[in-house]
Amino acid sequence: MRLLGALIGLAVGVLGAAIVLTAYRRWVQPWQHRWGATDEEVWAAMPGDELVPAAASTTRAITIAAAPEDVWPWLVQLGYGRAGWYSYDWIDNDGRASADHVVPELQDLQIGDQILMGPGMGPAVRAMEPNRYLVAGDREGGSWCLALNPAAGGTRLVSRWRVRWPLTPATVFWVLLSDPGAFVMERRMLKGIKARVEGAAVGSAA
């Protein structure tokens, strides 16, 4: 009887997990993957797309009440060991607070420079056009583009990740496990950039 009860419990657990996973993949994940982005932004080609063809992608965006040239300095200084990620610093910046101002000595970002995600790891800058876009990544793992598009009322900051994973049970499990966390961190980053840029604009106008 104990064995039967254990098997029934296991079956119920597996079924419950399958239902939750299916619901997440069908309704939650699509919303996460395009948070804040319009249909046009989701389907538009962006710099860096060619680095990783036939890849899974996310496109997220936010409107910032400032000109692209006022947003750009905050992008070129981001990264671990630099200005931080403007996100949850206790997770991605060793607890050090992300910069709340533009740091002049961090503005000279060049092609080939590494943007660290953590100690010793991170993609290299592959392309950039000041005040327009910044692309980092490689052909093996993935690419990341931050684009600044002028819009009514300011700038649309659009972030696109493209990743090609080998299709194995381990990678599928890892993607499903890390996907919600990546969304939470990136949304916080986009909101953090917006708050800093708009706060700086208010401060300079005062």
Region locations from a protein language model:
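Beta-strand/loop substructures that line and gate deep hydrophobic ligand-binding cavities in soluble
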Residues: 38-42, 138-195
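Short, hydrophobic/aromatic-rich segments at coil-to-beta transitions
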Residues: 112, 127-136
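A short, structured loop/turn motif at beta-sheet edges
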Residues: 65-69, 127-131, 147-156, 197-202
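Intrinsic-disorder/low-complexity, polar/charged segments enriched in Ser/Thr/Lys/Arg/Asp/Glu/Gln
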Residues: 7, 17, 55-61, 133, ...
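Glycine-centered loop/turn motifs
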Residues: 104-121, 126
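Membrane-penetrating hydrophobic segments
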Residues: 1-11
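Hydrophobic ligand-binding cavity/cleft-lining segments
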Residues: 9, 18-110, 203-206
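Hydrophobic pocket/interface hotspot
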Residues: 71-74, 125, 157-159, 193
